[in-house]
C-alpha cells in the first residue's frame, strides 16, 4: 500500500523557502480572503486544476484577471499567491516521482527570489513574470545548485560536435546571489550527473542572456571578476543589441530608462551606468560550451 504523502500548506511552503516574515504575513492575509469566500476558494481550486492540465493559457489568464478584480489585490500578488497554492500540489508530484523534499524545496525556492525581485523593483509582494514559472511547475526546468536548466533545441552548429536542432541544456541564472566560479562548476557537475552527457561524453550547455552580451561584458566586467569568469566560459555564437535595455532593472532594481533615476551605489551599477551614459546599449549573447567534469 502506497504511503500517504503529506502536503504542506501555504505558510509551510513560504517558511521552507525562506520568505521574509512580512511577505509571509501578507500572503497569509491574502489567502484568508479566499478562505472566507467559498466561491473564491472553489475558483482557486479549479484554476489550479486548469494550471496543471494546460499551464499558461488564455483561459487561465482570463480567470485570474477576475480574481484580481474580486480580491482588490494587485495582479502580481494574486499571481504569487496562486503559485504558492499550486506549490502544495507540486510537492506531491515531486514526491510521487521519487524526488526528495530537499530537492523540491531547492527548486521551489525560485519563488522566493521572484518575490524579492518584485518587492525591490515595484514595492509589491508578488511576482512580475508569472508565465516564467511554467517550467518549474511542469517539471521541465530544474534547479541544480546555483543554476537552473531545461532542454532546448539548439539554434547553431558548434565545435563540429553540436548541430543546429540538437537537444542541449539551456542555463538560467536566478537572482540568488553572486556567480561564484566554484558554485558554477558545482552546478555544471550536478547537471552532468542529473541529465547525463548529450554529445559523446560531454554535456552541451547554452545560455541566451544579457549577461553574455560581448560589447557590455568586455567593457564592464573587471578581469578576474565572477561575472567575467562566467562570461569567459562560453563561446559566443550570436549577439543582438537591445535598444530598450530591458534587463538593466536586474542591476539597478528600477524599471526605468531615465539615467538620472538610476542608483550608482555598487561597482556594477557604476560601470553599467557609465556604459549606458556613453550612448551604448545592452543586448543578448547566445553562448555555448561543452562540459565534462574533471575526475
Give the positions of each predicted feature.
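Conserved acetyl-CoA-binding loop-helix of GNAT-fold acetyltransferases
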Residues: 178-195, 205
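Non-catalytic substrate-recognition and accessory regions of acyl/acetyltransferase enzymes
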Residues: 2-179, 197-204, 215-295
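An acidic- and aromatic-residue-enriched active-site/binding cleft used to recognize and process polar
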Residues: 208-212
